Amino acid sequence: MKKRIFIGSSSEQLTILNEIVDLLGDDVECIPWTDAFALNKSGLDSLIKQTRLADYSILIATKDDLTKQRGESLTKPRDNVVFEFGLFLGAAGPEKCYLIAEEDTDLPTDLDGITVAKFTRNSGQYNSLDKIVESIRTHLVKIAEMSQLGLLPSTALAIGYYNSFIKRVCEEIHGSECVELEGKKIKVKSFRVDVVIPETLDDNGVGNFTTLYNKRYGLSKATTCTNPALLGTRGFPFHFKVDPPDANQESPVDIHLLDIPSTLSTIVESLKLYLPSNQVGQDFDMDYLEMRELENFAKVLKYLIGRNAATKGYVNVLTNVKL
């Protein structure tokens, strides 16, 4: 999925904006400010919506206005560029919001002490526009593999799901070498876990998908084994199948656990609050946010799985799964 980048500038600098769009190429989806304002909406409403939809932003500060300050003539960027930088910076954080300034542009003193990329219009220089944009591209690639806590919940959901379920289930099976099916303990020779991430979420989250998926693949419900001698212990429920299906369950068997994280349903409710709509029909912005959250959930989960010996090599994450 391509990342979205909002690009803002003054109306006089559309040539530079379009050059940046060309330099970024087809690896990302650029949203110039000229395409960001919806009809019958205020400019502020449209900008706030873009802070929620864009993964990154680039604001271009150029020498647009000549002002006098304490008797000194200064060349300053347009006010809207400074405002939009603050808006996106507050929404996404400094790792995802870039201000690039033309050389000798007088910036607000609030930015003193912050490294701002300053470009020249002269090609061939160390800080020519193409080199500045390339440095941003490099940084985007670097942070693309990382996840951050944001206004939407996928990172926190993945951490909670891993710690409270995936890791615990693996630790329990490693320790007890058994599972419980209808009160009967089945010895486990080996196991693997597939976490199933649906391609899309419906209005019921993953509830209906889970029911149909388990039915289609003939999965049985079981739990991890409990120790009656230990008060307060409980079995962790999951769906599984025996490989092969006709294996003698009186002997240790290979089991295949499959789980569709019910916590993904939280994403649906969060998106309704995050980007409310009073229309019926397909909402491409909502679809994009949903895809972004599912992708991020899977990315965080894979990272956590790979860092623990109890889960690494035992748990796979299946993405974009269809019925």
Curated annotation (Swiss-Prot):
Disulfide links within the chain: none
Upper classification of the organism: Bacteria, Pseudomonadati, Bacteroidota, Sphingobacteriia, Sphingobacteriales
Function in brief: Effector protein of a CBASS antiviral system with NAD(+) hydrolase activity. CBASS (cyclic oligonucleotide-based antiphage signaling system) provides immunity against bacteriophage. The CD-NTase protein synthesizes cyclic nucleotides in response to infection; these serve as specific second messenger signals. The signals activate a diverse range of effectors, leading to bacterial cell death and thus abortive phage infection. A type I-D(GG) CBASS system. Upon activation by 3'3'-c-di-GMP forms filaments which hydrolyze NAD(+); filament formation is required for enzyme activation. Induction in an E.coli strain that synthesizes c-di-GMP leads to significant growth inhibition. Binds c-di-GMP and 3'3'-cGAMP (3'3'-cyclic GMP-AMP), but not c-di-AMP, 2'3'-cGAMP or cUMP-AMP.
Domain-related comment: The N-terminal TIR domain mediates NAD(+) hydrolase (NADase) activity. The cyclic nucleotide binds in the C-terminal bacterial STING region. Upon binding to c-di-GMP the STING region closes around the ligand, which is bound by residues from 2 adjacent subunits; binding of the weak activator 3',3'-cGAMP only partially closes the domains. STING-STING interactions are the main drivers of filamentation; rearrangements in the STING domain allow reorganization of packing of the TIR domains, forming the NADase active site; cross-filament contacts strengthen the assembly.
Phenotype upon changing R168A: Requires 100X more c-di-GMP for activation
Active site per the UniProt annotation: E84
Residue stretches making up the TIR domain: 4-120
Enzyme class, spelled out: hydrolase
Subunit structure: Forms homodimers which subsequently form filaments. In vitro in the presence of c-di-GMP forms filaments up to 300 nm in length with an ordered array of parallel-stacked subunits, where the TIR domains form one face of the filament and the STING domains form the other face. Antiparallel double-filament structures are also seen. 3'3'-cGAMP weakly induces filament formation, while 2'3'-cGAMP does not.
Source taxon at top rank: Bacteria
Any one Pfam family match given in the protein's UniProt record, by short name: CAP12-PCTIR_TIR
Record-given protein name: CD-NTase-associated protein 12
Encoding gene, per UniProt annotation: cap12
Activity control summary: NAD(+) hydrolase activity is strongly stimulated by c-di-GMP, weakly by 3'3'-cGAMP, very weakly by c-di-AMP and not at all by 2'3'-cGAMP. Self-association of TIR domains is required for NADase activity.
Alphabetized UniProt keyword annotations: Antiviral defense, Hydrolase, Nucleotide-binding
Residues the entry annotates as binding 3',3'-c-di-GMP: S164, F165, R234, P237, D259, S262, T263
E.C. number(s) listed in UniProt: 3.2.2.5
Effect caused by changing K167A: About wild-type activation by c-di-GMP
